[in-house]
């Protein structure tokens, strides 16, 4: 059996997943695109050593920052982990905020064309608005389902259309199949989520995100996209103050969470799990247990 737990950054899904895994004697499989990097546990908000001691975690801190990573590689490796978990007679809990990675694990691998380095190089010279306009002209329906402000998704969807010669709907037909298991999405009021994100940004700065960034060697193109990495490097070069850096980190995280909420609204199969400031991770996990009939 596989369970899925989603939610925007800062919603508390990792803590809920740990509580739920303890209750079910389950193991956690991350669907986060950046927690795979060993050298970035603070910036990626990877599970703490204490949480990893409580519950087995997979797909966390498995590769160096010099290595590129993508959703297809993640899918194949995570699926092997899930097969091994099931072979031990245990439940797998998939959680993480990277939409495509999560979607592949819940609904299967898309047959879309692989990444095209030449196209990506050409995209680098274009604005997000220009890329989205081109996607709209080639595949209006696909563009309508694409977040125009999310450059990563705009680039990938345009890449699929150009390299594959077919609209997005053709490649995503496999996603019409039922999910591999039940899923929940943690939802919080936006002001509360924004406050949690502000505390998270402050905590990252206090707990070593600056030192973590300063100690990095060369990074792959994928690792370079880690949220906050460019901001802290700018601070280290003296271009912005520490206070400004923390504020911009919180802002960038809020913007990312907004994009995640937009994507999650389209995932109608996920059951809503409303959360308030008074709800502990354990209380939220207990509500999932009740819905599972435990």
Swiss-Prot record:
Substrate binds at residues 9-14. ATP binds at residues 7-14. The keyword Flavoprotein does not apply. Its cofactor is Mg(2+). GO terms for molecular function: ATP binding; tRNA dimethylallyltransferase activity. SUPFAM superfamilies: P-loop containing nucleoside triphosphate hydrolases (SSF52540). It is an enzyme of class 2 (transferase). Keywords: ATP-binding, Magnesium, Nucleotide-binding, Transferase, tRNA processing. Monomer. Belongs to the IPP transferase family. Catalyzes the transfer of a dimethylallyl group onto the adenine at position 37 in tRNAs that read codons beginning with uridine, leading to the formation of N6-(dimethylallyl)adenosine (i(6)A). This is tRNA dimethylallyltransferase. It comes from Akkermansia muciniphila (strain ATCC BAA-835 / DSM 22959 / JCM 33894 / BCRC 81048 / CCUG 64013 / CIP 107961 / Muc).
């Amino acid at each position: 059996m596989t369970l899925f737990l989603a939610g925007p950054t800062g919603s508390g899904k990792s803590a809920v997943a740990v509580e739920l895994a303890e209750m079910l004697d389950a193991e956690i499989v991350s669907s986060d695109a950046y927690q795979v990097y060993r050298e970035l546990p603070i910036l990626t908000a990877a599970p703490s050593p204490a949480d990893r001691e409580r519950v087995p975690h997979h797909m966390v801190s498995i590769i160096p920052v010099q290595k590129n990573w993508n959703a297809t590689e993640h899918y194949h490796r995570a699926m092997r982990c899930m097969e091994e978990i099931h072979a031990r007679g245990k439940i797998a809990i998939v959680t993480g905020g990277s939409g495509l990675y999560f979607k592949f694990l819940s609904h299967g691998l898309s047959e879309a064309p692989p990444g095209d380095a030449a196209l990506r190089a050409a995209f680098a010279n274009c604005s997000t608005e220009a890329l989205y306009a081109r996607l709209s002209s080639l595949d209006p329906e696909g563009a309508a389902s694409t977040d125009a402000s999310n450059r990563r998704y705009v680039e990938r969807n345009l890449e699929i259309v150009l390299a594959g010669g077919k609209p997005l709907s053709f490649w995503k037909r496999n996603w019409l199949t039922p999910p591999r298991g039940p899923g929940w999405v943690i939802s919080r009021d936006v002001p509360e989520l924004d406050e949690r994100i502000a505390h998270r940004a402050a905590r990252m700065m206090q707990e070593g995100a600056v030192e973590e960034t300063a100690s990095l060697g060369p990074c792959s193109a994928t690792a370079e996209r880690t949220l906050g990495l460019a901001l802290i490097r700018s601070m280290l070069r003296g271009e912005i103050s520490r206070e400004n850096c923390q504020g911009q980190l919180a802002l960038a995280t809020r913007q990312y969470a907004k994009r995640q909420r937009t994507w999650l609204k389209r995932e109608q199969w996920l059951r809503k799990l409303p959360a308030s400031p008074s709800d502990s991770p354990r209380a939220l996990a207990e509500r999932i247990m009740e819905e599972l009939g435990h």
